[in-house]
C-alpha cells in the first residue's frame, strides 16, 4: 500500500483532519503512531463501534495503534467512575474493546493497550501537569473540556485538570496522532496551543462524527433509551430499534456508520422487499417515505444482533467482572 492509499484509508469517513500535511510527510518515512483514548466510565455501547471501525482502518493502513484506557480521567470527570470501581471498569473496557476489535477482523496483536495510571502517577508527568497548568487560565480549561467533561454549575477542580492531562498524553504516549470524536475538538485545540509552551510538538488530530441517539441528539451511556448496550438481549435490541423514530436520523446514522461498514467487511448485503440497497438509495427512500419501515427496522435489529451477539455471549461468561464493574444494573 503506497502513501496515497494509506492516507485515503486513514482519512476515510472522518469529520475533520488537523495537520494532514504533516501526516503525509511522516507516512513517506515510516508508519504513523496513533492513539485513541477512552475514559473508563459507563458501559461501552453500539456507538463505540464508530471509533473501533476507524481503528481497523488505521491498522490496515499500517499504523501503530495505542488504546489508552483513561482510568484516572474517569475519576476526574465529576466522579463518573468511583475510585473503588476504576480498576474493574478498566478491565471491563479492555476485554470488551478487544472483543469488538476481533469481531470486525482486527489483528489485536497490532494494538497496544495502556492504562493512564501506568504513567500518569510518575514524578515527571506530575511536574509537567504543574507546568501546563501554570500556563492555563481557568476559562481555558473550562472551554477545552466543555464538550467532553460533565458540565455542572460549580465545577470541581479535578474536571479542569482533565484537558491538561489529555494534552500531555500525546507526549507521554510518544504518538504522532490523537484520534477522537468531533466532541474532542476543543481539547485537541488546547493541546495544539499549550504543548508547544512546554517545548513539546503539536500533534495531528483526526476526528470522527458523533452518532446521534436513537431518540436524542447524542448516544450516551447515561441515557438508556438513546443507546444499544453491547450486553442488550436480542429482544431489547428489537424493542429499542422499533421504538425509535426515523425523523431524528439516529437509525439512519447507525446504517451509515456501523451497519454498512460491517456488511462491507463480511461481504453482506442489505436487502429490503427483495431489493438490494446501497446506503445512498436507502437514505433516499427513507426520506421519500417509500420504504417499509417495519422491514427496515427488522433488518437493523438483525444486523446489530449479529454484530454484538458474540461479544455479549463472551462477556456474559464473566458475570463477576460485570458485577464488580457496574453492579447488577
Swiss-Prot record:
Gene3D superfamilies: HUPs, Tyrosyl-Transfer RNA Synthetase. GO terms for molecular function: ATP binding; tyrosine-tRNA ligase activity. A motif ('KMSKS' region) lies at residues 218-222. SUPFAM superfamilies: Nucleotidylyl transferase. It holds the Pfam family tRNA-synt_1b. Its main location: cytoplasm. Its EC number is 6.1.1.1. GO terms for cellular component: cytoplasm. L-tyrosine binds at residues 35, 162, 166, 169, 184. Keywords: Aminoacyl-tRNA synthetase, ATP-binding, Cytoplasm, Ligase, Nucleotide-binding, Protein biosynthesis. It is found in: Cytoplasm. It is an enzyme of class 6 (ligase). A motif ('HIGH' region) lies at residues 40-48. GO terms for biological process: tyrosyl-tRNA aminoacylation. It comes from the Eukaryota. It catalyses: tRNA(Tyr) + L-tyrosine + ATP = L-tyrosyl-tRNA(Tyr) + AMP + diphosphate + H(+). Homodimer. Belongs to the class-I aminoacyl-tRNA synthetase family. This is Probable tyrosine--tRNA ligase, cytoplasmic. It comes from Vairimorpha ceranae (strain BRL01) (Microsporidian parasite). The lineage of its organism: Eukaryota, Fungi, Fungi incertae sedis, Microsporidia, Nosematidae.
Amino acid at each position: 500500500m503506497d502513501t496515497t492509499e494509506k492516507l485515503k484509508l486513514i482519512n476515510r469517513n472522518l469529520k475533520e483532519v488537523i495537520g494532514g500535511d504533516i501526516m503525509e510527510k511522516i507516512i513517506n518515512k515510516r508508519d504513523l503512531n496513533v492513539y485513541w483514548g477512552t475514559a473508563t466510565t459507563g458501559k461501552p455501547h453500539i456507538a463505540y463501534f464508530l471509533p473501533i471501525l476507524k481503528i481497523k482502518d488505521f491498522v490496515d493502513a499500517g499504523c501503530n495503534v495505542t488504546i489508552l484506557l483513561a482510568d484516572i480521567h474517569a475519576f476526574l470527570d465529576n466522579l463518573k467512575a468511583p475510585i473503588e470501581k476504576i480498576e474493574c471498569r478498566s478491565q471491563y473496557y479492555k476485554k470488551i474493546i478487544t472483543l469488538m476489535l476481533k469481531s470486525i477482523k482486527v489483528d489485536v496483536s497490532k494494538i497496544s493497550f495502556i492504562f493512564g495510571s501506568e504513567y500518569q502517577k510518575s514524578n515527571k508527568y506530575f511536574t509537567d501537569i504543574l507546568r501546563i497548568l501554570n500556563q492555563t487560565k481557568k476559562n481555558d480549561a473550562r472551554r477545552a473540556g466543555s464538550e467532553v467533561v460533565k458540565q455542572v454549575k460549580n465545577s470541581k477542580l479535578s474536571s479542569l485538570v482533565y484537558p491538561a492531562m489529555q494534552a500531555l498524553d500525546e507526549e507521554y504516549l510518544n504518538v504522532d496522532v490523537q484520534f477522537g470524536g468531533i466532541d474532542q475538538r476543543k481539547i485537541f485545540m488546547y493541546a495544539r496551543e499549550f504543548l508547544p509552551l512546554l517545548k513539546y510538538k503539536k500533534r495531528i488530530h483526526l476526528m470522527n462524527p458523533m452518532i446521534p441517539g436513537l431518540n436524542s441528539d447524542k448516544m450516551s451511556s447515561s441515557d438508556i433509551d438513546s443507546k444499544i448496550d453491547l450486553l442488550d438481549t436480542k429482544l431489547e435490541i428489537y424493542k429499542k430499534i422499533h421504538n425509535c423514530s426515523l425523523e431524528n436520523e439516529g437509525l439512519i446514522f447507525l446504517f451509515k456508520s456501523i451497519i454498512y461498514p460491517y456488511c462491507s467487511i463480511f461481504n453482506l448485503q442489505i436487502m429490503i422487499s427483495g431489493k438490494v440497497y446501497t446506503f445512498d438509495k436507502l437514505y433516499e427512500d427513507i426520506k421519500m417515505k417509500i420504504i417499509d419501515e417495519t422491514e427496515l427496522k427488522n433488518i437493523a435489529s438483525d444486523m446489530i444482533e449479529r454484530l454484538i451477539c458474540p461479544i455479549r455471549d463472551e462477556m456474559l461468561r464473566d458475570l463477576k467482572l460485570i458485577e464488580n464493574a457496574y453492579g447488577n444494573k
